[in-house]
């Protein structure tokens, strides 16, 4: 292949930096610099301060971060439960029925998240299940949006499982429930933790559907960031964005460590 040659490796490295720096690294560095600024009228910010981070650690900002963490935790656990159950059920179906189930779970990802938010709002704004104005409608919307990723991740892991493990357990007298709990789920644990981390990260950054549903006492951090930038407080909003990124990365690092330990068992 081209990248096996010395020139190919150099070209790949140059292409990576040419694409990575302006498209990914530079915008994040700009947000980081803006979070410490009080003024930005030239190439670099001036009037450096940590006041924006001090404000982010108290009051409304801290409550919004807590709300985002709790919402993401609840949504990722629900999505992992539903997605795993559906993937296990789909594994026993025929190809045609499995394709239908795949399409149903992918549908919320195929449409704009604001459409999902509107659908959840309409569905849960009337009895018998009246959740409009509560935190639970936000959790449900996030769960609907991220369950597809849990389902796809677990489905892919199930296809890679060696059936010899299950056959060996069954030959020793283990029933279906015991095979599931003692063989399949432990083998799936690395994929389950990866799916949970992905669902958590996606939920932490969700905004479009959340804007349609959140009640005043349950404001996630992305909504607060949008509100800050909308009223012109770009530097304060940048600090909140850095806090959101840091919290998400720390959670993903924790999940990665759990996944590594599970993979080495």
Residue ranges with predicted function:
Residues 8-41, 54-159, 183, 187, ...:
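Membrane-water interface segments at the C-terminal ends of transmembrane alpha-helices
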Residues 44-57, 216-230:
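Short hydrophobic, aromatic-rich alpha-helical segments embedded in or entering the lipid bilayer
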Residues 168-169, 179, 183, 225:
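Hydrophobic positions on the alpha-helical face of helix-turn-helix-like DNA-binding modules
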């Amino acid at each position: 292949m081209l990248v096996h040659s010395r020139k190919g490796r150099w070209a790949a490295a140059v292409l990576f930096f040419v694409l990575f720096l302006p498209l990914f690294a530079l915008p994040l560095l700009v947000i980081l610099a803006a979070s410490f600024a009080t003024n930005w009228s030239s190439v670099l910010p001036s009037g450096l301060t940590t006041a924006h981070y001090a404000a982010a650690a108290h009051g409304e900002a801290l409550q919004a971060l807590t709300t985002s963490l709790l919402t993401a935790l609840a949504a990722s656990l629900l999505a992992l439960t539903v997605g795993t159950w559906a993937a296990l059920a789909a594994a026993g179906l025929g190809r045609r029925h499995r394709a239908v189930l795949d399409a149903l779970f992918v549908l919320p990802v195929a449409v704009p998240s604001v459409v999902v938010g509107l659908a959840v709002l309409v569905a849960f704004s009337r009895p018998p299940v009246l959740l409009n104005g509560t935190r639970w409608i936000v959790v449900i919307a996030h769960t609907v949006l991220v369950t597809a990723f849990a389902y796809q991740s677990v489905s892919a892991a199930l296809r890679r499982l060696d059936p010899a493990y299950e056959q060996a357990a069954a030959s020793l007298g283990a029933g279906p429930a015991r095979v599931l709990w003692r063989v399949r789920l432990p083998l799936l644990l690395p994929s389950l933790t990866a799916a949970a981390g992905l669902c958590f990260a996606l939920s932490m950054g969700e905004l479009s559907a959340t804007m349609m549903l959140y009640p005043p006492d349950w404001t996630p951090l992305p909504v607060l960031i949008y509100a800050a930038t909308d009223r012109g407080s770009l530097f304060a909003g940048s600090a909140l964005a850095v806090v959101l990124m840091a919290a998400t990365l720390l959670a993903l690092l924790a999940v990665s460590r759990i996944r590594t330990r599970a993979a080495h068992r």
